[in-house]
A protein has these predicted regions:
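Helix-start (N-cap) detector for alpha-helical repeat units in TPR-like alpha-solenoids
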Residues: 191, 225-226, 259-260, 293-294, ...
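Secondary-structure boundary elements
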Residues: 39-103
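Structural marker of alpha-solenoid helical repeat scaffolds
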Residues: 220, 254, 287-288, 321-323, ...
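Long, contiguous interaction/recruitment modules in multidomain scaffold/adaptor proteins
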Residues: 91-228, 233, 237, 242-256, ...
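Canonical tetratricopeptide repeat
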Residues: 196, 230, 264, 298, ...
C-alpha cells in the first residue's frame, strides 16, 4: 500500500484552506465571444514572469531580510509578509495565473502564481527554494458543455532549511500521487505558467490568445504532455482535426497514462469515425483508471451523485485498497455506506478517516455525517 512521505506545511497557510485546489473554475465556453471582445495577446517573457517589482523588493527587505539572518526565521517572516495584513494580505483566486508583478498589483494568486512568487522571494531572501510539480492531484477540470478535459497541473514550493526539506502548498489537505512533489526546472515551471494562461484563454473563447500561450509553453518544454493535450483540444475546436490528432498522439507518447489525453483522443477518434482506435484508447483508459485511486474516487463521487450507491461503494473501496492512507477516500466510503443504510460500516470508515486526517478533520467529518443523519431522518419521515 502507498504511504506518502511526511510533508511540512507552513501553519500560517491555514487561512486559505477553504479554497479549492488549483483546479480551475472557468466560465462556460459553449458560446465564443465576438472577435472584437478578444483581449490582445500579450505574452510575458520568462524574465517578466519572475521579476520582483521594486516596491515588493523593498517590503521583502524590511519585513524579512532585515529582521533576521536565520533562514528558518526568514521563512516564517516571508509567510507572514505574504499573508499578513501589514504585508501583501494575499487572497486565493483559482483563476489568478499571474506574474510576480501582477500578484503584487492584484494581491491575488492561484497555486501556480503563489509558487512562482514564493520561490522568487525566498531566493531573494537567501532561502534555498524550488518549484515542485505534482503529477497527479485534482488538477484538471471538466467542461461539461463541450465534453473535454483540460490539463492544468499542480505545483507547489519546496524549501531547504539546515538540511531539512519542507513543502509549502496553498492546500495542506492536497492529496498527492505515489511520487509526491518532484523538483522541476525553471523551463518546466514556465511551461506550466503559459499552459495555465492558455487554458484560461481557451475557456474564455479566445482561441488566438490560447494558441499564443500554448506555443510559449512548448518553447519552454516540448516534453510537457499537458500542453500537447491542450493544443489538441484547441486544434479540434478550430476544426483542424489532423493537427489535433498529432498533438494528442504526442501527448500520449510522452505520457501514455494521462487521463485527459486518453479521453480527448478517444473522443476525437469517435468524431472521425475511427471506432476501432477509439475503443482501443477507451480500453486503455479503463485499465489505467482501475489502478488509479484518484480515478476510482472520482468515479465513486459521480456514482454517489447519481444515486448509484452500490456502484459508489465499489469504486470507493477500490480507491481505499489502492491508497489506504487517504482520509478523503475513507470518508467518501463512510458517506456512501451511511446513505446506503450500512451504519456499522459507515462508523468504521468514519473512525478511520478521522484517525488519518488528525484533529483538524475530526470535527469536520462528524459535522458532515450529523448533517447527513438529519437529512436521512427527514427523508424517512416523508415516506
Amino acid at each position: 500500500m502507498y504511504r506518502p512521505a511526511a510533508r511540512i506545511f507552513v501553519v500560517v497557510l491555514a487561512a486559505l484552506m477553504a479554497a479549492p485546489l488549483c483546479a480551475q473554475n472557468h466560465p462556460r465556453t459553449d458560446a465564443l465571444p465576438p472577435i472584437g471582445s478578444v483581449t490582445p495577446v500579450e505574452v510575458p517573457s520568462p524574465e517578466q514572469v519572475f521579476a520582483i517589482p521594486p516596491a515588493m523588493r523593498a517590503m521583502l527587505q524590511a519585513q524579512v531580510i532585515d529582521r533576521s539572518s536565520s533562514r528558518e526565521q526568514r521563512l516564517q517572516a516571508l509567510v507572514e509578509m505574504i499573508f499578513g495584513r501589514q504585508g501583501l494580505d494575499l487572497q486565493y483566486d483559482a483563476n489568478a495565473t499571474y506574474t510576480v508583478d501582477e500578484v503584487w498589483q492584484q494581491r491575488r494568486a492561484n497555486c501556480l502564481a503563489f509558487t512562482l512568487m514564493f520561490v522568487a522571494l525566498a531566493r531573494e531572501a537567501g532561502i534555498q527554494a524550488r518549484v515542485q510539480e505534482v503529477g497527479q492531484v485534482v488538477s484538471w477540470y471538466q467542461d461539461q458543455d463541450a465534453g473535454v478535459v483540460y490539463s492544468v497541473g499542480h505545483v507547489n514550493a519546496g524549501v531547504e532549511i539546515a538540511g531539512r526539506y519542507a513543502t509549502v502548498d496553498l492546500d495542506r489537505n492536497v492529496l498527492y500521487d505515489r511520487h509526491g512533489p518532484q523538483p522541476v526546472s525553471r523551463a518546466r515551471a514556465l511551461a506550466h505558467f503559459y499552459n495555465n494562461r492558455g487554458a484560461e484563454r481557451m475557456a474564455e473563447g479566445d482561441l488566438v490568445g490560447a494558441r499564443a500561450f500554448f506555443d510559449a509553453s512548448v518553447v519552454q518544454d516540448r516534453a510537457f504532455p499537458s500542453v500537447w493535450n491542450n493544443l489538441g483540444v484547441l486544434d479540434n475546436r478550430e476544426g483542424n482535426t489532423d493537427a489535433a490528432r498529432q498533438a494528442l498522439d504526442r501527448a500520449l507518447r510522452l505520457d501514455g497514462r494521462q487521463d485527459a489525453a486518453l479521453t480527448n483522443a478517444s473522443a476525437l477518434y469517435r468524431q472521425l469515425g475511427l471506432d476501432a482506435q477509439a475503443k482501443a484508447l477507451e480500453r486503455r483508459l479503463k485499465s489505467v483508471q482501475r489502478e488509479d485511486p484518484f480515478a476510482q474516487y472520482m468515479l465513486g463521487t459521480q456514482a454517489e451523485q447519481a444515486g448509484k450507491l452500490a456502484e459508489a461503494i465499489r469504486y470507493y473501496r477500490q480507491a481505499v485498497r489502492l491508497y489506504d492512507t487517504a482520509h478523503q477516500f475513507h470518508f467518501g466510503l463512510a458517506r456512501a455506506y451511511f446513505l446506503a443504510g450500512q451504519l456499522k460500516r459507515a462508523d468504521r470508515e468514519l473512525l478511520r478517516a478521522q484517525a488519518l486526517g488528525g484533529a483538524p478533520q475530526q470535527a469536520r467529518y462528524q459535522a458532515k455525517l450529523d448533517s447527513l443523519a438529519r437529512w436521512r431522518a427527514q427523508q424517512q419521515a416523508r415516506r
